Amino acid sequence: MIVLGLETSCDETGLALYDSELGLRGQVLYSQIKLHAEYGGVVPELASRDHVRKLIPLMNQLLEQSGVKKQEIDAVAYTRGPGLMGALMTGALFGRTLAFSLNKPAIGVHHMEGHMLAPLLSSQPPEFPFVALLVSGGHTQLMAAHGIGQYELLGESIDDAAGEAFDKVAKMMNLPYPGGPNIAKLALSGDPLAFEFPRPMLHQGLDFSFSGLKTAVSVQLKKLNGENRDADIAASFQEAIVDTLVKKSVKALKQTGLKRLVIAGGVSANLRLREQLETSLAKIKAQVYYAEPALCTDNGAMIAFAGYQRLKAGQHDGLAVTTTPRWPMTELTIPE
């Protein structure tokens, strides 16, 4: 089965072809970073229009790159949610229309399920069950995954997501968008112990809170009164986020008795987070798994693969084009 995956939940237009026998046949990705950079964040209307502009050219590029003919596509998977309404709708309309024209099934995929399953595309994929740490611009969650569609929420952020905190602090520091990679780069030359930023809710269950940390950084920047300590601020802020994510992940593994941790989402590319996770998990004889570097950020491959997992069980959507901008993973069902 060859599945076309379409990702348009935010500011990346990603398309990919997943072959159940040959694996990933090809993928293309267009980022809108330059478009949104001058605004310091994603402008939903601009994002939607840019998806419309790029979908057909990227589709043609993907088919040429992979050597797959449009008629060979067996099914279409598109991101149904969560995400920006307009952005989701462009991908859903494109995918549903294409599937209808080819007389093939289509299925709407949960964006974060795609991220969580992306490490299964690696050369050494994890086996179920595992704990998943999902960290992105819109989500920070710990899930126990027992199988496709069998997800138990262990903890989540009660306010800002980790990636959102990175972006907001970067904006405070006048760093370019996107904030996460730029803070990580600046942190390399800073002292992570220079400022003792709070780790809210560190010892309170498995939920997260990052708004207080963001406020603490804002207060510290005002105290510095123009003194350039940006590298130390970046390193200390990043350390507070990483410390919280690592300790909560270890706690989740101990609480569930599981020995495998999957980390997925854009923030999973953070090298300091990976380094600290590997060190901490080695102490409890647990393993950590990541997606391939190209699959950490939003992409079509994860949507194609997640869609395939459900399509092979006979699950697909009707003719109606549906999007779900707010969609808890716990509402997902087991494909039957």
UniProtKB/Swiss-Prot annotation:
Instruction: Tell me the Gene3D superfamilies matching this sequence.
Output: 3.30.420.40
Question: At the top level of its lineage, which domain of life is listed?
Answer: Bacteria
Keyword rRNA-binding in the entry? The reply is no
List the catalysed reactions. L-threonylcarbamoyladenylate + adenosine(37) in tRNA = N(6)-L-threonylcarbamoyladenosine(37) in tRNA + AMP + H(+)
Which parts of the sequence bind substrate? Answer: 134-138, 167, 180, 270
Q: How is the cofactor bound?
A: Binds 1 Fe(2+) ion per subunit.
Q: What is its main location?
A: cytoplasm
Q: Which UniProt keywords apply?
A: Acyltransferase, Cytoplasm, Iron, Metal-binding, Transferase, tRNA processing
- What molecular function does GO assign, one term? N(6)-L-threonylcarbamoyladenine synthase activity
Q: Where does Fe cation bind?
A: 111, 115, 298
Q: Where in the cell is it found?
A: Cytoplasm
> EC number(s) in its UniProt entry?
2.3.1.234
Q: Which family does it belong to?
A: Belongs to the KAE1 / TsaD family.
**What name does the UniProt record give this protein?**
tRNA N6-adenosine threonylcarbamoyltransferase
Identify the species of origin. Acinetobacter baumannii (strain AYE)
